[in-house]
């Protein structure tokens, strides 16, 4: 709704500027939100600079030329010094309520757009995911959900490293040490992987065996490939379980080895050579990207002729470029250099480059993590801690409920807290995940937003019992005139613009912030305005419809954040 409000304001302002004797492009209208209006334009500043006139006088001149069409979302336009302020009218407010009631879960969805292939998580299958990995998963999954709601056709992929050095170590470890298959499969893999690294540190001579395994895989040795596949399958099966619990889904798992077997890796190396950028450095084949601003060369082939992860990743990206209109990668900050080199190399051979979302790292108060050293808290362990603490809270708040209810709510609240607390921070900022704070209702995180949704559900259930409320009965939104009612309607109307912003800038945290603000607006409304207790029947019906609208938009926001919206807590 807000996007349409802005579009109408743009049209009205552009026409008024034309009538005032000036010309301006849409991009020069410079709209912004303001505490003094629903939209404010700085166009008078722009025009004053060009025509050497007083911006305050120009703003008044433009406003005097404004004509608001019948039925417009704009109710009033005024000048405030050099600013041109736009105020939403009754058609906008009433239209928002009616749109939410009609569209329900479709409210905030954009028109169909391009096809996007988005890759995220893609952690090495050498053990369980830890909290560092799941920031990638949460950012990527939330972005996919935002993009889908914005109208994009999104396919999400996980790129499986099934043949790199770490996987060679995993395969070697599985042959050397016994797997404890009574444990979750990715944890069993981590156990032997950690043991193998201890062994390799003590006896560096074994590294030759690792190198030999990698050469055999590249040469297509069937038995070695089978051992690699078995180890990788076990790890990936466990990783999928973890992601499923976090409400993260991938449409496709793509194996790195696919591109070696198909000949795509060989082909892309030959095409890179043809650019004249390659040279030999200590027997290895490297790419000179100095004209792209990279002093460090990119190694694409080892001295023994085997390919690297990066080489295979280049082939993967070329394949992806043919699958979609846009390619998006979600990488940690440690991939900043390599992702830049990858983009430059693809550009050099005429392949569509990916858009890259780089995120800084998340840590726990306990410190840093490393799968190789065995110094990590798995995502599974973290989830168990958080949901366990959430269960205790539910038991305290709702002792009369069943064990199944408590367990279900604890899982929704605990995992919601993890997702929200991680995604609420802008990707480029590092963060420390403190699960106790994430579960604190006073911190206004996921539990607070979920509770606001449950509260709306509870009000509506009570209304059906006590006030004979009929949700299908037509209501009059124009009866919603209190400040807190109007504030809530305007906040709901912002949903489509928040989705649009998150999709355009690939910033999922804007939706997390919005969801909290929406919960605030709903709770303020309910605090100051009687709903079921409203004396006038028509006003009561309108306010209950507004509660229903808030429930819908809170649910849509939580769903797009990948968080369960409980009906009762």
UniProtKB/Swiss-Prot annotation:
Gene Ontology process terms (BP): arginyl-tRNA aminoacylation
Keyword annotations: Aminoacyl-tRNA synthetase, ATP-binding, Cytoplasm, Ligase, Nucleotide-binding, Protein biosynthesis
Protein EC: 6.1.1.19
A family per Pfam: tRNA-synt_1d
CDD domains named among the record's database cross-references: Anticodon_Ia_Arg, ArgRS_core
GO cellular component: a single term: cytoplasm
SUPFAM superfamilies: Anticodon-binding domain of a subclass of class I aminoacyl-tRNA synthetases, Arginyl-tRNA synthetase (ArgRS), N-terminal 'additional' domain, Nucleotidylyl transferase
HAMAP family: Arg_tRNA_synth
Family to which this protein belongs: Belongs to the class-I aminoacyl-tRNA synthetase family.
The protein's name: Arginine--tRNA ligase
Originating species: Methanosarcina mazei (strain ATCC BAA-159 / DSM 3647 / Goe1 / Go1 / JCM 11833 / OCM 88)
């Amino acid at each position: 709704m807000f996007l349409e409000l802005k579009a109408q304001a743009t049209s009205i302002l552009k026409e008024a500027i034309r009538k005032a004797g000036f010309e301006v492009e849409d991009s020069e209208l410079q709209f912004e939100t303001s505490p003094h209006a629903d939209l404010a334009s700085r166009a008078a500043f722009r025009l004053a600079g060009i025509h050497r006139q007083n911006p305050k006088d120009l703003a008044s001149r433009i406003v005097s030329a404004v004509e608001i069409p019948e039925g417009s979302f704009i109710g009033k336009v005024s000048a405030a010094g050099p600013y041109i302020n736009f105020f939403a009218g009754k058609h906008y407010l009433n239209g928002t309520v009616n749109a939410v009631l009609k569209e329900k879960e479709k409210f905030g969805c954009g028109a169909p757009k391009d096809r996007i292939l988005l890759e995220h998580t893609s952690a090495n299958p050498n053990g369980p995911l830890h909290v560092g990995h799941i920031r990638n998963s949460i950012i990527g999954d939330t972005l996919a959900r935002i993009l889908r709601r914005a109208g994009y056709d999104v396919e999400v992929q996980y790129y499986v490293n099934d043949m790199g050095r770490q996987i060679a170590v995993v395969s070697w470890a599985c042959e050397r040490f016994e797997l404890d298959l009574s444990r979750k499969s990715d944890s069993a893999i981590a156990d032997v992987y950690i043991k193998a690294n201890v062994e390799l540190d003590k006896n560096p001579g074994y590294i030759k065996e690792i190198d030999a395994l990698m050469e055999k895989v590249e040469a297509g040795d069937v038995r070695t490939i089978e051992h690699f596949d078995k180890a990788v399958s076990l790890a990936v099966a466990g990783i999928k379980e973890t992601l499923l619990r976090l409400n993260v889904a991938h449409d496709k798992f793509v194996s790195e080895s696919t591109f070696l077997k198909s000949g795509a890796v060989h082909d892309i190396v030959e095409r890179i050579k043809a650019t004249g950028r390659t040279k030999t450095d200590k027997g290895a084949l490297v790419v000179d990207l100095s004209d792209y601003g990279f002093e460090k060369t990119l190694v694409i082939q080892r001295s023994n002729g085997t390919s690297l992860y990066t080489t295979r990743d280049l082939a993967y990206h070329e394949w992806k470029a043919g699958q979609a209109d846009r390619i998006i990668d979600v990488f940690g900050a440690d991939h900043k250099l390599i992702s830049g080199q990858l983009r430059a190399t693809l550009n050099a051979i005429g392949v569509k480059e990916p858009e890259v979302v780089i995120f800084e790292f998340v840590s726990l108060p306990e410190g840093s993590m490393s799968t190789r050293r065995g110094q990590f808290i798995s995502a599974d362990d973290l989830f168990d801690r958080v949901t366990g603490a959430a269960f205790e809270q539910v038991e305290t708040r709702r002792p009369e409920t069943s064990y199944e209810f408590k367990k279900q709510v604890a899982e929704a609240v605990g995992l919601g807290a993890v997702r929200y607390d991680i995604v609420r921070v802008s990707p480029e900022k590092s963060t420390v995940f403190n699960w106790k704070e994430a579960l604190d209702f006073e911190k206004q995180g996921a539990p607070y937003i979920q509770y606001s949704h449950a509260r709306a559900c509870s009000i509506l259930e009570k209304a059906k019992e006590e006030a004979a409320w009929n949700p299908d009965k037509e209501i009059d939104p124009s009866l919603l005139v209190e400040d807190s009612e109007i504030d809530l309607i305007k906040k709901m109307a912002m949903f489509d613009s928040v989705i649009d912003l998150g999709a355009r800038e690939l910033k999922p945290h804007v939706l997390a912030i919005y969801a909290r603000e929406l919960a605030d607006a709903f709770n303020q409304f309910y605090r100051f305005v009687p709903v079921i207790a409203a004396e006038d029947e028509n006003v009561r019906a309108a306010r209950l419809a507004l509660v229903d609208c808030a429930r819908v938009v809170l649910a849509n926001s939580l769903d797009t954040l990948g968080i369960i919206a409980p009906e009762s807590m």
